[in-house]
């Protein structure tokens, strides 16, 4: 009986890992993206992994969100609840995205604009209470502030995104550094 329970746990873990491995990475978009996300907090929600229609349902929902420019983002559902947790109920991650050329991007207070790393997956380090990911990421993002373009990076969202190395199960996380303030193009 004990070995049967252990086998069930192992099989379930393998299915979850394989599902994560099969997630296609977010495609790079030419130019810059200006986005407003409906639901930024994320974590591990197992239900969408086992629902073959979850992506299709989210795409349908996101079409009705705010405007026709709204798109389903990232190929996953985000959990209802605080970021960094495990949730059994999920909502779709709908983002309004517009392609704009870099000089036209203006800072909008309180809005996510351009992210250096859009890959999102299961990153275990930031879940651990003894790992001060916020401090580490704030320092990392501050180091990027000497950009010649005048972009100002800020640590965004209180979480880490996985390092992009193809698709796979990520243990190490990279900081999600976002440009929050961008110098406006000088009017001439």
From Swiss-Prot:
Localization, UniProt: Secreted
Disulfide bond entries: 37-95, 45-77, 58-92, 62-94, 123-178, 137-175, 141-177
GO biological process assignments: defense response to fungus; killing of cells of another organism
Signal peptide: 1-28
UniProt keyword list: Antimicrobial, Disulfide bond, Fungicide, Plant defense, Secreted, Signal
Keyword Signal set for record: yes
GO cellular component terms, semicolon-separated: extracellular region
Protein name: Defensin-like protein 99
Family: Belongs to the DEFL family.
Top-level taxonomy: Eukaryota, Viridiplantae, Streptophyta, Embryophyta, Tracheophyta
Organism: Arabidopsis thaliana
């Amino acid at each position: 009986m004990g070995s049967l329970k252990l086998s069930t746990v192992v099989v379930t873990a393998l299915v979850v890992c394989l599902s994560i491995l099969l997630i296609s990475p977010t495609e790079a978009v030419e130019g810059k993206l200006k986005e407003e996300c409906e639901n930024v907090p994320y974590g591990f929600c197992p239900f969408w992994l086992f629902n073959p229609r979850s992506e299709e349902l989210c795409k349908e929902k996101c079409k009705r969100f705010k405007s026709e420019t709204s798109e389903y983002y990232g190929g996953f559902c985000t959990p209802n609840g605080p970021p960094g947790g495990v949730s059994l109920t999920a909502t779709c991650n709908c983002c309004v995205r517009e392609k704009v050329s870099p000089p036209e991007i203006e800072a909008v207070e309180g809005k996510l604009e351009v992210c250096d790393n859009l890959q999102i997956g299961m990153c275990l380090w930031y879940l651990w209470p003894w790992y001060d990911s916020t401090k580490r990421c704030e320092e990392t993002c501050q180091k990027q502030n000497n950009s010649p373009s005048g972009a100002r990076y800020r640590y965004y969202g209180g979480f880490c995104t996985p390092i992009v190395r193809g698709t796979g199960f990520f243990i190490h996380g990279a900081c999600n550094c976002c440009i929050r303030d961008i110098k406006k193009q000088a009017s001439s």
